[in-house]
Amino acid sequence: MAMSELGIQKTSDGTVSRLLNVVESELQAGREKGDPTEKQLQIILEDAPLWQRFKEVTNEMIVTKNGRRMFPVLKISVSGLDPNAMYSLLLDFVPTDSHRWKYVNGEWVPAGKPEVSSHSCVYIHPDSPNFGAHWMKAPISFSKVKLTNKLNGGGQIMLNSLHKYEPQVHIVRVGGAHRMVMNCSFPETQFIAVTAYQNEEITALKIKYNPFAKAFLDAKERNHLKDIPEAVSESQHVAYSHLGGWIFSNPDGVCAAGNANYQYATPLPLSAPHTHHGCEPYPGLRGHRQAPYPSAYMHRNHSPSVNLIESSSNNLQVFSGPDSWTSLSSTPHTSILSVPHTSGPINPGPSPYPCLWTISNSGGGPAGPGPDVHASSPGAFLLGGPAVTSPLSAQAPTSAGVEVLGEPSLTSIAVSTWTAVASHPFSGWGGPGGGGHHSPSSLDS
């Protein structure tokens, strides 16, 4: 029994010794800076260059009802204390002048007498009291100080808005007869208490150097990006094909409605590089489409056949999927699309999708074989209507007037009536008395 008690005592002594060694090693860094006589006591302001930058533009600190923390954070380094003596560190704020301030025309100017302050708030550092070695081992931060404009207790510092203050640090020796060891202040830490930042330069500095302001910065940048309009020159005729958010990277091989002599004023601002499919996703256009297509219009067609979308008005709209656009050539072809002259009236209607072709059968059924329209590839033309309701995707049967030849590079379409649908009127197109064939102009890239 005696042996067991002896073992427990040795274990306890070893634990206490280990803990004391940990405490001693922690305070050793502070002891090296100590002076039992306190004659070499010195206090240094940390981040002095940062404080100086704020002082040059007259620093401001926010005060709120619930209290707001300071930035820059007041941080000091102390040396010359008695390592084995107990000290408490206190912080208060003293007015620097005898008037209040106002921000006028980009600068702070005096604005009358100050408010009478009947209160005196002092902040006690939460590590107080502690050994001198503890205070000297590392910089001392007053990061938990909160500034308020309402006297509500809770250890917050009450300040009057639009008054200038200077922080003061006090070191008090405790453990016996309390006595003041030192008090000091730093002119570069002066600031004006405000309920909202007045100087934009102060706001910029706070955001730049305060790591906790990064969330505010990110939110501000996002809102700024939302406010930026997509600027397009007024001299340009911009016509995008809004097929599921895709734009053509090689649009000069796509047919355009209108007279062969008509050309767009300036090239479309499209990027030069090409992707594998010959078109580039441009999600930014999705939010600007007047009538976005449903997802069914982006059906990917890997076969040489042509997709037909039939609307309630018996108009057939023919276009190919994105994979077929790879066959578009960068040089215009004279045989891209040839349109026969018809004696029927042509009524171009408004459409948010310019430069598209529609095939209509006014007779309500097949009207007999019409002239063939040849394209160099299945995706060499786009056919669309001004309005689409109840889209249904189907493969074009040969009996419907659309003939798909065996050659993948050749598509023949037989129609009875061609109707040009474009957002721009084109002179010399169709009409009674006209003759000959009209080839649509190529879309400039």
UniProtKB/Swiss-Prot annotation:
Tell me which residues form the DNA-binding region: 45-218
Does this entry carry the keyword Transcription regulation?
yes
Which terms under GO biological process does the entry name?
Answer: cell fate specification; heart morphogenesis; mesoderm formation; positive regulation of DNA-templated transcription; regulation of transcription by RNA polymerase II
Task: Specify whether Repressor is a keyword of the entry.
Answer: yes
Gene Ontology molecular-function annotations: DNA-binding transcription factor activity, RNA polymerase II-specific; RNA polymerase II cis-regulatory region sequence-specific DNA binding
Q: Which UniProt keywords apply?
A: Activator, DNA-binding, Nucleus, Repressor, Transcription, Transcription regulation
What job does the chain carry out?
Answer: Transcriptional regulator involved in developmental processes. Can activate POMC gene expression and repress the alpha glycoprotein subunit and thyroid-stimulating hormone beta promoters.
Q: What is this protein called?
A: T-box transcription factor TBX19
What taxonomic ancestry is recorded?
Eukaryota, Metazoa, Chordata, Craniata, Vertebrata
